Design a protein with these regions (language model features):
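ER/Golgi luminal nucleotide-sugar-dependent glycosyltransferases, focusing on the catalytic module
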Residues: 2-172
Length: 172
């Protein structure tokens, strides 16, 4: 299927160095004042570090195939890691994403299938002109399984109307 092959979850993404191992990231964090931290990416990296990885598998905005049994077995043996992660009332840079940790555990245990074929159209319509939006959506092809449209609540009415009409047409 699109999510499991022979019972193993399909993980879509790519291998990347940790931010602190990337020259450009280090340079921009040191010399640019308006640095914006990507807490989700850092939380993915933290999950990989907990398990001893030297780089991380970056998961994109696609549905994750997760096995409840992997969560249960890991946190049953590592209760202190779970307790530390959930102790914060709000998102905190000391936290890891549970799905990122578990996906890296699946990789470590060789109990998953890695795929660099994202089969994804991802966009933030508020950052695109209506023309760019139309172009990108019209490039949607049969080999795409997933669509992620961010911040629709912030779209201008004409873009939102176009998107909703396009989605309605797509599902008919």
């Amino acid at each position: 299927t699109d999510f499991f092959i022979d019972g193993f979850p399909v993980l879509r993404g790519k291998w990347l160095k940790f931010d602190e191992d990337r020259f450009l990231k280090k340079f921009t964090e040191k010399y640019l004042r308006n640095k914006k931290l990507d807490s989700h990416r850092l939380a993915q990296q933290k999950g990989a570090k907990i398990l001893g990885f030297k780089k991380y598998y970056k998961f994109h905005h696609v549905p994750y195939a997760l096995r409840k049994s992997t969560f249960e077995s890991f946190f049953e043996s590592n209760k202190e890691i779970e307790v530390e992660n959930i102790r914060y009332k709000f998102r905190n840079l000391n936290q890891f994403t549970p799905q990122g940790l578990i996906n890296h555990l699946e990789i470590k245990n060789k109990t998953c299938v890695l795929s660099n074929k994202l089969q994804l159209i991802y966009m933030k319509p508020i950052r695109k002109s209506l023309w760019e939006l139309k172009y990108k959506l019209n490039s949607f092809s049969d080999n795409k399984l997933f669509l992620c449209l961010q911040s629709l609540d912030q779209c201008k009415p004409n873009k939102l109307k176009y998107l909703l009409n396009w989605l309605t047409f797509l599902v008919k």
